[in-house]
């Protein structure tokens, strides 16, 4: 039975209403600092911890709750007579409910202007200590670290004469240990990343110990294949515009492959400034286009490879209106993603309830790291977020690209970044014409891309080609030129660059080097 609560929170959302409800249930409230002032200003009867312990806060607030009268009241087992006798001897009442969340360390160190001193001052000491004490003694103490749990605790207290079930206490305790582990992991990541800076005046973005923390969003029916189990986890701090921010408006539950493919489509489409559509199959774009609106962009993207688009993932960077919805609804689609859907578009898809509609607000945030598991280890790299600007390009052939060709080259290069290596992409007039992906040799990717265009009835005459990495030999270049390409964009850097450039001059095509490779595995 909860008779006394200690409340000390950094995240004060909902805390006044929660405390008022506790007070209405006859619970005595202890508090500290800013939380105590907030509750007192709201008209609540609050006892400051310093008054409760008889020991003042000291060291600029570093020592507030580190006192036997606090931790004794939390840690005492109510079922052990010797514990209760010790409390009575030292005049220590039990603390039955602890409501604490911690100094905002992660938010502090994420600011560019954050100094080491700022970070250190935002390492909470008393909070984690109380949380761990209460979580350890969860049989007797209810501990709340997440404002989302306020309502659950109140409902149980009202229904059970101020008591909270062991099942709920156990669940809340596990949240505490997960929270403090994440908190300490963030501190470790930050401080170990500074080791090189302190010793060599250069900060290392990759800490000596790398801690990851995610919260489970949902269990999935299965993984990449039906015999694999799976779940989806969200980052503790989801970047603006990231897939994990999705709001599912309708449709079946998302699968593992749906989420993976949706991320590939969304990451590609949101890089465009004009209305764009990206169709993805098995994490590869099979059609990408820009247009005057979503409907035109979709029509052009679908032309690239109607066969592969069947059962694909479609992403837009503009609202899906009725016209676009009607066009998409004629095809079999697994997932449709957009910043928004008009009411008329929603009505179109109401007749196709299996289609998963995901609404995601646009944003340019991205993950800090790209992660890949290997046997017994983890590969960590910065995200491939490099977007080449026109001024960075270098024309290496006798013939320069025309303005139209340059537009097509930049479009092709943007798409190639999201195609599995080896990647060859034919483009023209704001749309992909043929995509060759994931082949072990670049020349085979070139052949496949040209075959794809032929199968779709699209001409490659006058097209632009992007290659995600350099041409190791002239053979790949010969294939794309034979198919009709008149300009090529590629990183360069091959030992045979001179031979490849000479071949381009021989064919009288324009070649542009980016100096940037976009391998994608």
From Swiss-Prot:
Gene Ontology BP annotations: 'de novo' IMP biosynthetic process
EC assignment: 2.1.2.3, 3.5.4.10
Annotated MGS-like domain residues: 1-145
Enzymatic reactions: (6R)-10-formyltetrahydrofolate + 5-amino-1-(5-phospho-beta-D-ribosyl)imidazole-4-carboxamide = 5-formamido-1-(5-phospho-D-ribosyl)imidazole-4-carboxamide + (6S)-5,6,7,8-tetrahydrofolate; IMP + H2O = 5-formamido-1-(5-phospho-D-ribosyl)imidazole-4-carboxamide
The gene coding this protein: purH
SMART domains in the record: AICARFT_IMPCHas (SM00798), MGS (SM00851)
Native organism: Paraburkholderia xenovorans (strain LB400)
InterPro entries listed in its UniProt record: AICAR_Tfase_dup_dom_sf, Cytidine_deaminase-like, MGS-like_dom, MGS-like_dom_sf, PurH-like
The protein, known as: Bifunctional purine biosynthesis protein PurH
């Amino acid at each position: 039975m909860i008779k006394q609560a200690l409340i000390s929170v950094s995240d004060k959302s909902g805390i006044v209403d929660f405390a008022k409800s506790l007070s209405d249930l006859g619970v005595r409230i202890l508090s500290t600092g800013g939380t105590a002032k907030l509750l007192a200003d709201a008209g609540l009867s609050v006892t400051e911890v310093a008054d409760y312990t008889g020991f003042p806060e000291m060291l600029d607030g570093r020592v507030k709750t580190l006192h036997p009268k606090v931790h004794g009241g939390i840690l005492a087992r109510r079922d052990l007579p010797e514990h209760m006798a010790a409390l009575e001897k030292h005049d220590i009442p039990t603390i039955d409910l602890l409501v604490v969340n911690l100094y905002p360390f992660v938010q502090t160190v994420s600011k560019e202007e954050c100094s080491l001193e700022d970070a250190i001052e935002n390492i909470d000491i008393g909070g984690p200590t109380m949380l761990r004490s209460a979580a350890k003694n969860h049989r007797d103490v209810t501990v709340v670290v997440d404002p989302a749990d306020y309502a659950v605790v109140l409902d149980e207290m009202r229904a059970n004469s101020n008591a909270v079930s062991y099942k709920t206490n156990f669940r809340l305790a596990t949240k505490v240990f997960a929270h403090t582990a994440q908190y300490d992991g963030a501190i470790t990541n930050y401080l170990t990343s500074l080791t090189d800076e302190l010793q060599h005046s250069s900060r290392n973005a990759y800490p000596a110990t790398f801690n990851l923390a995610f919260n489970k969003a949902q269990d999935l029916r299965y993984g990449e294949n039906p015999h694999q189990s799976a779940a989806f986890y969200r980052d503790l701090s989801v970047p603006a515009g990231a897939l994990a921010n999705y709001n599912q408006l309708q449709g079946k539950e998302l699968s593992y492959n749906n989420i993976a493919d949706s991320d590939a489509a969304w990451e590609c489409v949101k890089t465009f400034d004009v209305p764009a559509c990206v169709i993805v199959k098995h994490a590869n774009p099979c059609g990408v286009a820009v247009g005057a609106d979503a409907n035109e962009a979709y029509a052009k993207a679908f032309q690239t490879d109607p066969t592969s688009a069947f059962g694909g993932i479609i992403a837009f960077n503009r609202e899906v209106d009725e016209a676009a919805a009607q066009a998409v609804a004629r095809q079999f689609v697994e997932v449709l993603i957009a910043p928004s859907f008009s009411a008329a578009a929603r009505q179109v898809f109401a007749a196709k309830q299996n289609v998963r509609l995901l609404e995601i607000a646009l944003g340019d945030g991205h993950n800090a790291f790209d992660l890949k598991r290997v046997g017994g280890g983890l590969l960590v790299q910065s995200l491939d977020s490099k977007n080449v600007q026109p001024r960075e390009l270098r024309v290496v052939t006798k013939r320069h690209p025309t303005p139209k060709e340059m537009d097509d080259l930049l479009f092709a290069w943007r798409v190639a970044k999201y195609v599995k290596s080896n990647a060859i992409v034919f483009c023209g007039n704001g749309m992909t014409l043929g995509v060759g992906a994931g082949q072990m040799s670049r020349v085979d990717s070139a052949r496949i891309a040209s075959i794809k265009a032929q199968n779709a009835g699209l001409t490659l005459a006058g097209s632009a080609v992007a290659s995600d990495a350099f041409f190791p030999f002239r053979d790949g270049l010969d294939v794309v030129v034979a198919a009709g390409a008149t300009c090529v964009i590629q990183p360069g850097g091959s030992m045979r660059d001179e031979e490849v450039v000479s071949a381009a001059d021989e064919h009288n095509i324009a070649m542009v080097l980016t100096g940037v490779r976009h391998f994608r595995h």
